[in-house]
Regions:
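Conserved NAD+-utilizing ADP-ribose enzyme module
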Residues: 1-163, 170-179, 185-246
Length: 247
């Protein structure tokens, strides 16, 4: 639960420095592409004697030290938790929030949650955050700081029972009962057909009381739901071989 009235910025900074000193995970494309909370590439720029220089932080321990020193200075000079969060590598936004949450005010927590969720490519399948944790995050958030006024109005104006859609491919076909659905069937169709796949569109019913957020920042008409309250989940009628899902 997030109960702080004010953010403990020093606590957020300390947590961010801990993330900074985690190992850099190399990939098949390293040093060009790496995995780390504060960078997605092994190449970075640092200032040496007033001159910017490109260094490879995966190959030189001194270069890695210089880079971490530079990022530490940026963390320490930050004026807000959101500023520190924006320094993180996109795939690690939700991880940052997970570890920073007990230092954050409800307002900061809610604003970072909304941004991190939208920026993440596939937050429903984040291995660091089980569905129960993701759901508790949205349940703890303050709607007025989680959504824009237009988004709040859209959520408020929904019928008491809402039809929602979800498009899946072979990549996430086993995760139909996820938090993320859409009010727009065409959006679900796009998700089902991306990556040149012939995926599946599902539709379901859910009571509005079990919808925790509506996001339209990516024009996806996305709703965040409590999956256990989804009803009548079926393959969409326009797809072949309509069938019910049994759980």
């Amino acid at each position: 639960m997030v109960n702080r009235k004010e953010t403990n910025l020093d606590g957020v900074k300390a947590m961010a420095r801990t993330l900074l000193y985690t190992d850099i995970n190399k990939t098949a494309y390293s040093p060009m592409i790496v995995q780390h909370p504060f960078t997605n590439t092994g190449f970075t720029m640092v200032m040496k004697n007033g001159t910017p220089q490109c260094i490879d932080i995966t190959a030189d321990s001194n270069a890695l030290h210089e880079w971490r020193k530079m990022v530490c200075q940026q963390i320490d000079s930050s004026k807000s938790a959101f500023e520190i969060y924006m320094m993180t590598n996109k795939p690690y936004g939700m991880t940052f929030l997970k570890y920073a949450s007990h230092h954050l005010s409800k307002k900061d927590f809610s604003q970072i949650l909304a941004d991190a969720w939208i920026r993440s490519e596939n937050p429903n399948d984040d291995p660091n955050l089980p569905q129960s944790k993701l759901l508790s995050m949205f349940q703890s958030a303050e709607p007025k700081h989680l959504m824009s006024q237009d988004e709040l109005n859209t959520l408020k104006d929904l019928d008491s029972t809402v039809t929602v859609y979800r498009g899946v491919t072979s990549f996430n076909a086993k995760n139909v009962k996820a938090l993320s659905w859409t009010l727009d069937r065409s959006v679900a169709e796009w998700f089902a057909s991306r990556f040149d796949e012939d995926g599946t569109v599902y539709q379901a019913q859910i009571d509005k009381s079990h919808i925790y957020a509506y996001f339209d920042g990516r024009n996806e008409s996305e709703v965040i739901v409590d999956p256990k309250y989804l009803m009548d989940i079926t393959e969409s009628e326009s797809m072949d071989n309509s069938f019910d899902i049994t759980m």
